[in-house]
């Protein structure tokens, strides 16, 4: 078993504007039965309550990632809208925007048919990226992914439970694409199982190293069902992609007290404040 020591220059400061109003919004999102919700049998991403997890991450985006209502969001691995649905209640309908991509057609169709008609600045597209679990017949290798947006198109890129299903060589490509797509001051919000060889003895997952590389896996039958990555490799590749790492925060999968389950990387595109609000 392995775990990560805290590797961060300093904790990311909480957004001072994220006060009682945000608490009210997050509670409302969990209890509002009129919010879009996919049929139970069609939810193919993760476990747990769809609304509660979406609301939780909206809180993380704002408090930790410093997401603002006017910003342009890119959701890599948007699934069936678990992050998009709560964002409809936060992003400014005239200045903010959201684009999500995923290889699973069912999720994209549900989002495009359910969310976009009511929120036209929320857009979804399927990319036929090959993945042994989610899209085994995909035509595009993960090492050749290039998202169809111009440089600096976004202020906030999220990869929630994406790195946990990628081999190291594909993760490097995604980091490079995130850096390309972020405008100056933009943030990457990425969750991962980041490992450095230490252990708390309380981890909920036990990882084994994949051959001699920086990748790890927890499930023998399906290595990419829960993939880990060397923390040093993750930090180095994020920097090589052109981003400045602000923090790598350990998650409570390790058996420790934390606000989030997976480890959380926050990295920033150098160059000042983002230039959101144009889409």
Descriptions of predicted regions:
Residues 70-79:
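Conserved class I S-adenosyl-L-methionine
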Residues 167-168:
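Helix-capping/helix-break motifs at membrane-protein junctions
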Residues 172-184:
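A short glycine-rich, Lys/Arg-flanked "PGG" loop and its adjoining helix->strand segment in the class I
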Residues 72, 186-187:
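Short glycine-centered segments of the SAM/dcSAM-binding site in methyltransferase folds
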Residues 72, 97, 153-155:
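Structural signature of beta-strand start/N-cap positions in the alpha/beta core
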Residues 161-162:
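Short catalytic micro-motifs in class I SAM-dependent methyltransferases
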């Amino acid at each position: 078993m392995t775990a990560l020591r805290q590797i961060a220059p300093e904790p990311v400061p909480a957004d001072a504007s994220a006060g009682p109003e945000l608490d009210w919004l997050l509670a409302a999102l969990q209890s509002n039965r009129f919010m879009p919700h996919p049929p139970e049998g069609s939810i193919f991403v993760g476990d747990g309550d769809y609304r509660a997890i979406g609301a939780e991450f909206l809180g993380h985006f704002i408090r930790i990632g410093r997401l603002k209502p006017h910003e342009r969001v890119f959701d890599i691995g948007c699934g069936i809208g678990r992050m998009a649905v709560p964002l409809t209640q936060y992003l400014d309908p005239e200045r903010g925007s959201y684009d999500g991509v995923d290889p699973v057609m069912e999720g994209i169709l549900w989002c495009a048919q359910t969310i976009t008609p009511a929120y036209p600045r929320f857009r979804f597209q399927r990319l036929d990226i090959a993945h042994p679990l989610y899209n085994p017949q995909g035509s595009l290798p993960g090492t050749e992914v290039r998202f169809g947006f111009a440089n600096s198109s976004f202020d906030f890129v999220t990869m929630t439970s994406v790195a946990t299903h990628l081999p190291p060589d594909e993760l490097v490509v995604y980091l490079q694409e995130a850096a390309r797509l972020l405008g100056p001051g933009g943030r990457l919000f990425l969750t991962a199982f980041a490992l450095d060889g230490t252990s708390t003895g309380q981890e909920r997952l036990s990882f084994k190293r994949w051959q001699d590389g920086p990748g790890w896996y927890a499930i023998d039958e399906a290595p990419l069902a829960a993939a880990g990555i060397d923390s040093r490799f993750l930090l180095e590749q994020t920097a090589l992609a052109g981003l400045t790492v602000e923090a790598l925060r350990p998650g409570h999968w390790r058996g420790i007290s934390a606000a989030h389950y997976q480890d959380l990387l926050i990295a920033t595109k150098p160059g000042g404040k983002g230039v959101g609000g144009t889409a």
